[in-house]
Amino acid sequence: MKKLDYHFHSHFSADSEELPRKHVTEAIAHGLEEICFTEHRDFYFPGMDFSLNLPEYFQEINRLQAEFKDKIKIKIGLEMGIDLRFKSEINQFIDSAPFDFVIASVHEIGDIEVYDGTEFYLQKIKEEAQREYLLACLDVVQNFENYNSFGHLDYVARYGPYTDKSIKFAENREILFEILRALASKEKALEINTRLFDDPKTEQFYSDLLINFKKLGGKFITLGTDSHIAKRDWLSIHKARTLIKKAGFHELATFSGMKIDKNKKSIKE
């Protein structure tokens, strides 16, 4: 299984100040073979401008690709926040540049962001908030096609005013089955996002996702830290790789030009 990170952000994303070069050198220092920058783009996001300067982004990553070509493979990707009201604009943006890889994510519902104990959670118990978020994710996977992997299904577990923010597969089984079934049938990848892997409940959630995705015919898994700084939680990456292998997935999916790569066995394993 290749050692990689397929979800992280640099200063090209509005919520990060990290230098792209630092991500590259940190990845090389820890033996990663391949990385993919996945900068944010969200249309009309409340409270923050998640625009993306594509010429500058591609120029910088192309320069790093050339500089480090003998040490690590670097891909250029995108994390696209999907609001189906702006489906046409989103598709135009994705098609406007030669991205290697696109993550589809849900960061807001309507005009309300799912972030940091905000309005989204008011007058909702945890289970109601999680159900609303997952239904929005289901709407995206059923009605949007222009992406490779669906990002952080546990995003709603990061935020909210609850003592226990964790999300459980069993409590959301019906919706999650529909999401996984849609991803599998459309041959989209499921992202394993290590952001919350310091909590054993997150490991259990992703273990359940992986096992059921496999049962439903899912083929492709991507792994990402969602790091907004160069430093990463390497133990969480190790835990995630172990879960992926236990579920019966022997390779992580990688992409070029938004097409799946024909992966070869890692020479470092």
From Swiss-Prot:
SMART domains reported in the protein's UniProt record: POLIIIAc
An individual GO BP term: L-histidine biosynthetic process
Catalytic EC class: hydrolase
Pathway in which this enzyme or protein is active: Amino-acid biosynthesis; L-histidine biosynthesis; L-histidine from 5-phospho-alpha-D-ribose 1-diphosphate: step 8/9
EC number: 3.1.3.15
Annotated S-S bridges: none
An MF annotation (GO) of this entry: histidinol-phosphatase activity
Presence of keyword Lipid biosynthesis: no
Signal peptide coordinates: none
Annotated Gene Ontology cellular component terms: cytoplasm
Keywords: Amino-acid biosynthesis, Histidine biosynthesis, Hydrolase
Gene3D superfamilies linked to this entry: Metal-dependent hydrolases (3.20.20.140)
Entry keyword Manganese: no
Lineage: superkingdom: Bacteria
Catalytic activity: L-histidinol phosphate + H2O = L-histidinol + phosphate
Recorded family membership: Belongs to the PHP hydrolase family. HisK subfamily.
Name the record gives this protein: Histidinol-phosphatase
Organism: Lactococcus lactis subsp. lactis (strain IL1403)
Annotated gene: hisK
